[in-house]
Amino acid sequence: QVRKKDSGEIFAMKVLKKDHVVRRNQVEHTMTERRILENIKHPFVVSLRYAFQTTQKLYMVFDFFNGGELFHYLSTGGRFSPERAMFYGAEITMALGHLHSLNIVYRDLKPENLLLDAEGHIKVTDFGLSKQGVVDDNVKSFCGTPEYLAPEILKRETYGKVVDWW
């Protein structure tokens, strides 16, 4: 977390070394993440507040959510009540529905990428693997977190937004 000097506000900051981004062939993914987050305004999607760079690093500044990752709650508590699971499921569904209405496929839905705000609402974060301009089942790239990959991706078939529901 970081603090804005003039206001004292606390934010989360993602710092990427440019040479690391280039070496790992992540330039397009990084640019896509910034482009998407600059334009998305949704209550269940993290907001990009600022983005800047130095000669060696890229910085993306987001609202800070002190509720932590959904993964943490699952790994320490084991499970949610049916009501809480439905509540989170509804918010995730609304976030993905909004992304899909903008022809964005998220491709990395997992508890580690779901943050909780102070009121207990979901915030989808980490758009590094997202893809814009997905109208039909026209995506072929193999990406995502292995434990959460949809069958279409594993089989190296073309796919579309439906993989986000897996």
Regions flagged by a language model, labelled:
Residues 50-51:
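A short, aromatic-enriched beta-strand patch in the conserved N-lobe beta-sheet
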Residues 153-162:
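Conserved end of the kinase activation segment
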Residues 10, 15-41:
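Conserved N-lobe beta3->alphaC-helix segment of eukaryotic protein kinase catalytic domains
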Residues 2-10:
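Conserved N-lobe loop of protein kinases adjacent to the ATP-binding glycine-rich P-loop
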Residues 57-69, 73:
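Conserved short submotifs of the Hanks-type protein kinase catalytic core
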